[in-house]
UniProtKB/Swiss-Prot annotation:
Protein name per its UniProtKB record: Small ribosomal subunit protein uS15
Pfam families with a match to the protein in the record: Ribosomal_S13_N (PF08069), Ribosomal_S15 (PF00312)
Composition-biased stretches (Basic residues): 1-16
Record flagged with keyword GTP-binding: no
Lineage: Archaea, Thermoproteota, Thermoprotei, Thermoproteales, Thermoproteaceae
Coiled-coil ranges per UniProt: none
Naturally occurring in which organism (per UniProt): Pyrobaculum islandicum (strain DSM 4184 / JCM 9189 / GEO3)
Gene: rps15
GO cellular component terms attached to this protein's record: cytosolic small ribosomal subunit
Xref: InterPro entries: Ribosomal_uS15 (IPR000589), Ribosomal_uS15_arc_euk (IPR023029), Ribosomal_uS15_N (IPR012606), uS15_NS1_RNA-bd_sf (IPR009068)
SMART domains named among the record's database cross-references: Ribosomal_S13_N, Ribosomal_S15
Entry-linked Gene3D superfamilies: 4.10.860.130, S15/NS1, RNA-binding
Molecular function GO labels: small ribosomal subunit rRNA binding; structural constituent of ribosome
Oligomeric and partner information: Part of the 30S ribosomal subunit.
């Protein structure tokens, strides 16, 4: 339950390290961490999941202070690159799930509103990724064409 006069909403969550320096307890070299990242990616884990696995199972709080490179940069260097960035992909999957729900329940107006909100986030992210160069300029969000991602 949330505390009355705090803004945290009562959700538990892990705290990012305040000073991103290499902790003294880490026994892994930068090359070993890089190999762990590549191995986990080849086993099919997305970048966010790799970070969680490294934190929980290997005791590595952050990859960048140890290796000097971001996790996604390591994956790109080893030829493991996602066509669509992970956050955008997750939003697209959510929108496809809501669309499927609306096919069965067309009068569910709350879900229709939720779909509008999710799709506006998708359009904003697409604009950003086109500007930054992570998506090609001709990329267009088309739910029917991207329905193969729902699985």
């Amino acid at each position: 339950m949330p505390h009355r006069s705090r803004h945290k909403k009562g959700r538990s969550r892990s705290v990012r390290p305040a000073h991103p320096t290499v902790p003294t307890w880490i026994q892994y070299t930068p090359d070993e961490v890089e190999q762990l990242v590549v191995e986990l990616a080849r086993r099919g884990f997305p970048p966010s999941q790799i970070g969680i696995i490294l934190r929980d199972q290997y005791g590595i709080p952050l990859v960048k202070p140890i290796t000097g490179k971001k996790l996604t940069k390591i994956l790109e260097e080893h030829g493991i690159r996602q066509e669509i960035p992970e956050d955008l992909l997750n939003l697209i999957k959510r929108a496809l799930r809501i669309r499927k729900h609306l096919e069965e329940h067309p009068k569910d107006m709350a879900s229709r509103r939720g779909l509008q909100l999710v799709e506006s986030k998708i359009h904003r992210l697409i604009k950003y990724y086109k500007r930054v160069g992570k998506l090609p300029k001709e990329f267009v969000y088309n739910p029917e064409a991207l329905s193969h991602l729902a699985t």
